[in-house]
Each structure stands twice: as structure tokens, then as C-alpha cells.
């Protein structure tokens, strides 16, 4: 039985990669990487996101200047069709991932009830 669970996990991994939503994220990501300005904007977003997460984990809040930078970056992203498509595709994929997470972790949740 213990080997079977790994087989199921590997099967799930392949099934996720085969999802049209996953394929769409890959497709849009490749388009972003092929465009230098869009790729740079995406990298700025990732860096800003990591910075904000780090601040929040340490209990800090973004300054007014940082909030302005975040808003400006958000506006640039909203104006970029490729990035907009990427985040929409990510959102569609995240629905599956949330459902899968809920299903997979249900037995562990039962243990703490």
C-alpha cells in the first residue's frame, strides 16, 4: 500500500500537467519570457511580491511610498495583455489546486477534529 500512494501522487502530478489550465499558464509564461519588456515587468512584480511578503512576515507594513509603487506596478500589469492573461490563467489553475489540496489534506484534518 505504501508504494501505491506514491504512484497515485505521481499520477496526480501528471494529471495536473495535462490540465488545459496548466497548459495555458505555460503558454502565456513562454510568451512573457519572449518579450523583454513584459518579462522585466513580470520580474519587477515578483520582486515586489517577495518584498511585501517578507515585510508582512516580520510584522511590517508597506510605507506610503511603497504603496504608491505597488499601485503603479499594478496599473502597468493591468495594462499589459500578456500579464493580465497570465494572472487570469493562474487564477483558473488555482481553483483546481485549491480543490486538490482540500481533498488531499482532508484525512489530516480529520485527525485533529
Swiss-Prot record:
SUPFAM superfamilies: YheA/YmcA-like (SSF158622). Belongs to the UPF0342 family. This is UPF0342 protein SpyM3_0545. The lineage of its organism: Bacteria, Bacillati, Bacillota, Bacilli, Lactobacillales.
